[in-house]
Each structure stands twice: as structure tokens, then as C-alpha cells.
Amino acid sequence: MSANGQRRSHYAPRVLHIVPALFGPNDGIFGGAERYALELARHMSVETPTTLVSFGERERLETLGQLKIHVIGNPWHVCNQRTNPVALSLFSELRKADVVHCHQQHVLTSSLAALVGKLSGRRVFVSDLGGGGWDVSGYVSTDRWYRGHLHISEYSRKVFGQDDMPWAHVILGGVDMEKFAPDETVLRDGTVLFVGRLLPHKGVNDLVNAIPSNMPLELIGQPHEERFLEDLRVLAKGKRISFRHDCDDVALVQAYRKALCVVLPSVYKTMYGDVSKVPELLGQTLLEGMACATPCICTDVASMPEIVENGVTGFVVPASDSAALGEKLRWLREYPHEARRMGQAARERVLGKFTWPSVVQRCPEIYSA
């Protein structure tokens, strides 16, 4: 079912999605969290009146198919945290909604929306897509301020201690299967691909160490720590490694289609010794690569083994094990027919479990419960 053009023929609640992280090609941050919220809202707009609200440097009102997008301009940033914006005009959007779906729990905007919901009787739900900032949830639990928690993986529900809670649900994530699709006219060029923010917990340094010197590697994503970027450049010396910090969707799909494989080598403990319990809550770039019939390699970290079936749609390797990762990279290059079968199985897995229409279908059942 397309997210554009289909008319609604039944009454449905007005749903408001709130994305605290900055949003949009000029104001936004490259990453899976923003794409997740946008695509869920876009596909939901086919079934019910849907608005997506986020924040940016300038005020914008746009439409995407049947989705209304309101970017609130010039917000106040709590404690100068750029991903923790608040604005009074948010409350006018809350008044119009029957159901509110926040896409980050631990920011002040979401806590305010949840409190308004409790006072006004509106149903407010939350999906935690990672990140956060100063919030009252750092002092008191806001879990029950929300009607329900909609987790994007089993790991997410477990790590937040809600796996036995009746108000905590798993809706998973999806991919636009029309956009992210294989093209038989595009030849695989043997490039290994990483897509995501260049942050230490992504384990990109392990991938750089693992890549054979004669195998091309492309790293697509914005750097967020200058020290880490410089360390990656040092590790990449003498290898066929390229960095691409800006990439639109057309170029990204082409990169997925041409790649030997997509790798997401995230870690709990970074090369600097820092520890994260939630390095990945889903693994959106794995899903996008798999939708393009590209096999994937991930580490046995967080939610990623829920996506990649080891030996079927790709490989799951131990975290921070460059030797094991390098071995699987060489195997995929040496056995192209088997790699192709893995890619086909990967797309079938996404079609069976990780499409946006299936995610959208799960949400209204929970919204109305």
C-alpha cells in the first residue's frame, strides 16, 4: 500500500507525532531515529489524519503526501541542548490531537506532552529512539505519565525494564519497500558499506581495522566527534576507505544496491572505554540494506540480532572482534552466489516482518486499547 494518494473512507483519530530532535534536510540530523518517525507518520497519514511536529531554525509548514509537517522555528533549547527544544506553539498542536505519539521519552517536550495528556484526557504514547537531555524524568519516573510505551525492538523493552509490563508493546520498525529495493541493472562493485553517524559506540574503528587492504569501504554519515573522525582517518591510512558525510536518499539507495554488504559493528564499550547500554535500539540501516537485497553483518549487540539471521540473511559476529568481522567480509567476497542468496533472504525477511504498513497496523490497535 502506498503512503501517497489513497483516500480515507472511515472516521479515524487525529494523531500527532512529536520529534524533539531537529528535523529536515537543512535543520536536521542524519540518522535512523529521524527517518523512523517520519516514515511511520507518513504511512500512518494514509489511514488517519496525521501531523508531525518537530523543531528547527525557522518556522515551516509542509505536506508530504497526506502528512502535515510543522517545523516549529526558533525554539528554546533546554540547558542549551540542541536536541532538547521546547516552544509554546507546541501546545496549540496538542489541542488539535486525539492521540499523541512522542518519539523520545527523556526530553522536556515529551514530558510536557504527557502531562497535558493526563490533565486533558488525551492518549499520549512514547517510543524511545535513543538520546535525550535534561528532563524531569531524571528526578521522578515519568513512565506512567504515558498511556503506553511503544518499543521498536524486544531489546528496547527489556533494557528499559518493561518486558513484563502490560502497557509496554513492541511495534518494531519498517522500511519503504518501494524506495529501498534491489535493481537488477545495478552491478555489485564489492564495496563494504557503513551508514550512520560516525560516533564511537558505532564501532566503526573495528570495521576499519577489519577491512582487508584491497577491499573498498565507504563510510556514509555525519561525524559528531572530531577526535573520533581523526582517529578513523589515521586507522584508514593505506586502505581503500572513503568518507561521505552528505548523502541524499537517491544516492543512499544506489550505495546499498551496489554494496557487497552493509555492516553495523556497534559496541557496548567504545575504543575510549566509554560504555553504552543502548548502542542500538533497532538498526534502521540494516533494514534498509536488507530491503535492497544486500546481506548484512552486525555485532551481537543490543537489538541487531533480532534483525539479522546469522548465516541466513548475513552474519552476527562478536563485538570488537575485528578478526571475526574480517573473516566474514572475505567469505562474502569469495562466495558471491551464496552472498546473493543471503541478500534475497534478507529482503524476504524485511517483507515478512519489517514493513511500515505492518507497523502502522500495530499502532492503532494499541492507541485504542
Regions found by a protein language model. Give the residues of each.
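A conserved mid-protein helix/loop that constitutes part of the nucleotide-sugar donor-binding site
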Residues: 35, 190, 197-212, 227-230
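Short acidic/histidine- and often glycine-rich active-site loop of Leloir-type glycosyltransferases
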Residues: 272-273, 300-311, 315-316
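Conserved acidic donor-binding segment of nucleotide-sugar-dependent glycosyltransferases
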Residues: 310-311, 315-322, 331-336
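Short hydrophobic beta-strand element within catalytic cores of glycosyltransferases
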Residues: 264, 286, 295-298, 308
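Acidic donor-binding loop of glycosyltransferase active sites
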Residues: 257-279, 294
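Nucleotide-activated donor-binding/catalytic signature segment of Leloir-type glycosyltransferases, i.e.
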Residues: 221, 229-254, 261
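A short, well-ordered alpha-helix in the C-terminal region of glycosyltransferases
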Residues: 324, 331, 338-353, 362-365
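Donor nucleotide-sugar binding/catalytic pocket of nucleotide-sugar-dependent glycosyltransferases
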Residues: 132-133, 144-181, 284
